[in-house]
């Protein structure tokens, strides 16, 4: 499967039909052939979700922590043949969700006692830059297993330790890391459209050997960890940008899991 078959174009995202057997998560990514640099992960996140939804016949999609910035508008979701339900723990964030989208308020790492919880109610669950803020990620994965229908798929996209840039964010006091991020990215100031939340990085790693046993304990029949290296935090710092890029290119070439910067962690629930 080429990325052309997963393309979202212009104001009208569209998934072009492909005639392929269901296959496995690994074979899906083998055919897509992601680049090593994390820019690919950012650029192709929506297309990857649509590709997975198409390949595995997934229609009812829950976006975890999507409150203020949902994956698609209602029109985009409809055009791509999916029913999008936006989840968040915070009612204030859900109040910012686009018009027409369904919402579900519950804590993905909680006890799933909230009225909006629908066990086995989703064909797919996705999240982008959420899991690094979750306290209790292993429980979150167990809950995802409960919330997915048989054969359902989940994808979590998050930053990973111990990439130096995120290791620094992890060890610095929150007040200091806030100040650094606000200086580099003014749009992420408090009250803006993309505020910075405290990051815990629980189970946010890019090492398949570390993650897969935990995901199997959560009950998943199939797992895939797509690793990425590189980032854009030094783009406005000539010299440092080039050194960092060379470091990450080398790490990607040798497959150094310890310093991945981002990962797509993708799981599939058994059909039984």
Where are these regions (language model features)?
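Active-site micro-motifs of SAM-dependent methyltransferase domains
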Residues: 108-110, 132, 163
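Short glycine-/acidic-enriched loop or helix-start segments at secondary-structure transitions
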Residues: 72-74, 96, 136-137, 145, ...
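S-adenosyl-L-methionine-dependent methyltransferase catalytic module, highlighting the catalytic core
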Residues: 138-139, 143, 153-265
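Helix-to-beta-strand junctions that scaffold the AdoMet/dcAdoMet cofactor pocket
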Residues: 134-135, 148-150
């Amino acid at each position: 499967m080429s990325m052309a078959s997963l393309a979202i174009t212009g104001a009208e995202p569209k998934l072009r039909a492909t005639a392929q057997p269901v296959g496995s998560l690994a074979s899906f990514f083998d055919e897509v052939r992601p680049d090593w640099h994390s820019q690919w992960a950012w650029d192709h996140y929506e297309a990857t979700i649509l590709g997975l939804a198409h390949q595995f016949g997934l229609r009812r999609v829950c976006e975890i922590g999507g409150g203020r910035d949902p994956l698609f508008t209602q029109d985009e979701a409809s055009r791509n043949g999916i029913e999008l339900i936006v989840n968040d723990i915070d009612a204030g964030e859900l109040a910012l969700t686009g018009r027409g989208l369904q919402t579900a308020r519950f804590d993905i790492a909680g006890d799933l006692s909230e009225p909006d919880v629908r066990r086995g109610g989703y064909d797919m669950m996705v999240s982008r830059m959420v899991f690094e803020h979750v306290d209790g990620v292993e429980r979150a994965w167990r809950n995802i297993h409960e919330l997915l229908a048989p054969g359902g798929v989940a994808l979590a996209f998050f930053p990973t330790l111990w990439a130096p840039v995120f290791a620094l964010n992890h060890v610095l006091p929150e007040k200091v890391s806030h100040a650094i991020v606000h200086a580099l990215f003014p749009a992420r100031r408090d009250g803006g459209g993309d505020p910075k939340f405290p990051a815990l990085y629980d189970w946010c790693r890019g090492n398949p050997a570390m993650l897969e046993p935990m995901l199997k304990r959560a009950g998943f029949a199939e797992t895939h960890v797509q690793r990425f290296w590189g980032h854009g935090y030094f783009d406005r710092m000539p010299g440092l940008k080039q050194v960092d890029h060379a470091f990450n290119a080398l790490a990607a070439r040798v497959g150094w899991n310890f310093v991945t910067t981002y990962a797509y962690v993708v799981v599939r629930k058994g059909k039984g």
